[in-house]
C-alpha cells in the first residue's frame, strides 16, 4: 500500500507505516510502500 511519505531507504518507512496502522514498509520509487496487517 503506497503512502505519501518520501524516503531514501526502507528504514525511513518503519514509523510512517506503523502510524498508518500497518506493519512495515519499504521504499519504492522515493515513497513508502507499506504492508497491511
Curated annotation (Swiss-Prot):
Cysteine pairs bridged by disulfides in the record: 7-27, 13-32, 17-34
GO cellular component terms, semicolon-separated: extracellular region
Stretches of the chain forming a coiled coil according to its record: none
Keywords tagged on the record: Amidation, Disulfide bond, Ion channel impairing toxin, Neurotoxin, Potassium channel impairing toxin, Secreted, Toxin, Voltage-gated potassium channel impairing toxin
Entry's localization field: Secreted
Tissues expressing the protein: Expressed by the venom gland.
SUPFAM superfamilies the UniProt entry points to: Scorpion toxin-like
Superkingdom: Eukaryota
A GO MF label: potassium channel inhibitor activity
Residue positions, PTM Lysine amide: 37
Function per UniProt: Blocks voltage-gated potassium channels Kv1.1/KCNA1 (IC(50)=203.15 pM), Kv1.2/KCNA2 (IC(50)=8.92 nM) from rat and human Kv1.3 KCNA3/KCNA3 (IC(50)=171 pM) potently. At 2 uM, also blocks Shaker IR and has a moderate effect on rat Kv1.6/KCNA6.
Miscellaneous comment as given in the Swiss-Prot or TrEMBL entry: Negative results: has no effect on rat Kv1.4/KCNA4, Kv1.5/KCNA5, Kv4.1/KCND1 or human Kv11.1/KCNH2 and Kv3.1/KCNC1.
Family, as annotated: Belongs to the short scorpion toxin superfamily. Potassium channel inhibitor family. Alpha-KTx 03 subfamily.
UniProt comment concerning the protein's domains: Has the structural arrangement of an alpha-helix connected to antiparallel beta-sheets by disulfide bonds (CS-alpha/beta).
Protein name in UniProt: Potassium channel toxin alpha-KTx 3.13
Source lineage: Eukaryota, Metazoa, Ecdysozoa, Arthropoda, Chelicerata
Amino acid at each position: 500500500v503506497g503512502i505519501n511519505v518520501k524516503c531514501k531507504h526502507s528504514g525511513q518507512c518503519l514509523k510512517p507505516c506503523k502510524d498508518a496502522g500497518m506493519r512495515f514498509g519499504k521504499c519504492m520509487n522515493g515513497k513508502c510502500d507499506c504492508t497491511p496487517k
